[in-house]
Amino acid sequence: MNTKPTAIVYVSNTGRTARYAKLIAGKTGLPVYELTEAKKALPKKTPIIYCGWLMASNVKDYRKAARRYNVVALCGVGLCPTGELLTEVRKATGLPAETPLFTLQGGMDRAALTGIYGSMIDFLIKSMEKKKDPSEKDTAMLEMLKAGGDFVSEEHLGAVLEWYYAE
């Protein structure tokens, strides 16, 4: 690891990303700030772990955080199982190849989604229901989209903590 982070900064939509950020803070001893709080608390270019929720493989507000801070690792929290979609998320987010990326499964709470995001999930559900010969992953995803679920777990932090404590 080139630069050790000195804080965790996050943005959360339904609370799952906030919970992961706080779990990481609990395991590392790093202070944790919501993005708007961080602007008052942290100087520019502070090395941080940034955590944001995933939407269409893009980590919410990553670019905003990267303009202000030195993002030394990125955690994207979304629907996909932990450790999946790394290539897609890196590309959609515009994350440099040398920056460690971790995806963490958060879950789904349709009622907690605001604005256009709920409508987008409804559209995704309708699209997936029309799919002929869905895979097991498709079926599991559709079930989660419809029924909801919470998968935030300390167990999902293995790769993040391994990276943090390396060297």
Where are these regions (language model features)?
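N-terminal beta1-alpha1-beta2 submodule of the flavodoxin-like/Rossmannoid cofactor-binding fold
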Residues: M1-R68, G158, E162-E167
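FMN-binding flavodoxin-like domain, especially the glycine-rich phosphate-binding loop
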Residues: L54-E167
